[in-house]
Amino acid sequence: MHQARIKLTGTDPEKLAYVCDQLKKIAERTGVDLSGPIPLPTKKLVVPTRKSPDGEGKASWEKWELRIHKRLVGIGADERAMRQVMKVNVPDNVSIEIELKG
């Protein structure tokens, strides 16, 4: 049987959990195998900036951080299940990559 590997990426872990729950419900309804969601390492992007705009005075820095969370879900690539996966309502800041394996 074919397997679909779905990689979810986003900055809000609650929205990722929402999409994972939708995928779990699809797997239960269609009766296909489900593995995951597997949490992958969180990527931290740190941007240090100077607090003072003119460059004079004490060199104090602020650090801004963006965390990118990732989840990996494996689901059986049944035709019915894949049609429902394509119809899942995905929030704006969550991206999905689907890879089919034979």
Swiss-Prot record:
NCBIfam families with a match to the protein in the record: uS10_euk_arch
Role according to the record: Involved in the binding of tRNA to the ribosomes.
Protein keywords: Ribonucleoprotein, Ribosomal protein
Listed SMART domains: Ribosomal_S10 (SM01403)
Subunit structure: Part of the 30S ribosomal subunit.
Pfam families reported in the protein's UniProt record: Ribosomal_S10
PANTHER family for this protein: 30S RIBOSOMAL PROTEIN S10 FAMILY MEMBER
UniProt similarity note: Belongs to the universal ribosomal protein uS10 family.
Identification of the protein by name: Small ribosomal subunit protein uS10
Keyword Ribonucleoprotein carried by entry: yes
SUPFAM superfamilies xrefs: Ribosomal protein S10
InterPro entries tied to this protein: Ribosomal_uS10 (IPR001848), Ribosomal_uS10_CS (IPR018268), Ribosomal_uS10_dom (IPR027486), Ribosomal_uS10_dom_sf (IPR036838), Ribosomal_uS10_euk/arc (IPR005729)
One GO cellular component term noted in the UniProt record for this chain: small ribosomal subunit
GO biological process, one term: translation
